[in-house]
């Protein structure tokens, strides 16, 4: 299958470089798995600091309460998209924004790659 990228307007040079060099901002599956494992072990503490119920958090991130419960209790592994949803949520909560960085569950490597124009 040919996965050609098509545009309605011509992208600027930096956008073209990002598309061509997407490897510079992708994480390997092993890196993603490590971030997911680190976050999973901290979910109960983060949720307590955010003062939110499992049901409310599940609704925010787009899962059922049962699915979130299984993830928090390590009976189920979360997907990368669920991980990102949780990180984005906890980054917006004042009580947990700094905490996710200090716990090493915030993907600073990914943020640095997105922000580092020279990596592109």
Regions found by a protein language model. Give the residues of each.
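General nucleic-acid-binding
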Residues: 1-19, 108-110
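Short, conserved catalytic or interaction motifs in soluble domains
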Residues: 73
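Short, charged recognition helix plus adjacent turn
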Residues: 95-120
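A short, Lys/Arg-rich alpha-helix, primarily the initiator
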Residues: 21-49
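Short alpha-helical DNA-recognition segment
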Residues: 51-70
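DNA major-groove recognition helix of helix-turn-helix/homeodomain DNA-binding modules
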Residues: 81-102
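Short basic helix-loop element that most often maps to the first helix and adjoining turn
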Residues: 1-3, 41-57, 85, 118-119
């Amino acid at each position: 299958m040919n996965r050609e990228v098509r545009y309605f307007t011509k992208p600027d040079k930096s956008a073209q470089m990002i598309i061509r060099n997407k490897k510079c901002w992708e994480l390997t599956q092993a890196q993603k798995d490590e971030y997911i494992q680190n976050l999973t072990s901290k979910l109960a503490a983060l949720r307590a600091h955010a003062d939110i119920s499992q049901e409310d958090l599940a609704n925010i991130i787009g899962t059922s309460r049962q699915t979130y419960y299984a993830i928090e209790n390590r009976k189920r592994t979360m997907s990368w998209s669920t991980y990102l949803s949780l990180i984005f949520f906890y980054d917006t909560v004042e009580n947990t924004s700094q905490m996710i960085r200090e716990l090493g569950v915030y993907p600073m490597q990914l943020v640095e790659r997105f922000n580092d124009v020279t990596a592109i």
